[in-house]
Design a protein with these regions (language model features):
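Cysteine-centric segments in proteins
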Residues: 2-136
């Protein structure tokens, strides 16, 4: 069985990985940290590991999170409900999810911001269609 490495010098470890992290962040930071559209606005609260965006849509709150190789988008009346709706039923809550487009186990954690915003706009469209259909 392979044993996990033990980090004995945290500052040296952080200095060693800094160029890789900075390069990854530069590559994925291909869009704005805030965006809005008709009836919605969002702000990126974390740029990587996980990519996380929160905002308002039609008087509700939404939460987007991409981590590992997957992403989720959820809506609720409050911030807490929006987060909880991604893993349990909440009143007036809704969620959808999918897989990140990149290769590898961490394609969601390092998701390009343009991809995240596209998933958000597509999810808002899907949520609105469900609301109009009366399923909520």
């Amino acid at each position: 069985m392979r044993r996990a490495a033990v980090i004995t010098d945290a500052p040296a470890f952080l200095e060693a990985i800094k160029p890789v992290v900075e390069a990854n962040l530069a590559e994925i930071s291909d869009d704005a940290s805030e965006r809005s559209g008709e009836g919605w606005s969002g702000t990126m609260t974390c740029g990587a590991c996980p990519v996380q965006i929160e905002g308002d849509v039609d008087g509700m709150r939404f939460h987007f999170r991409a981590r590992g190789s997957a992403w989720s988008f959820s809506v609720g009346k409050t911030d807490e409900d929006a987060v909880r709706a991604s893993f349990q039923a909440v009143p007036d809550g809704w969620m959808t999810d999918g897989w990140a487009e990149g290769d590898g186990d961490f394609s969601g954690s390092w998701m390009p911001h343009s991809e995240a915003w596209r998933h958000i706009t597509e999810s808002i469209t899907a949520w609105r269609a469900v609301r109009v259909g009366g399923a909520l």
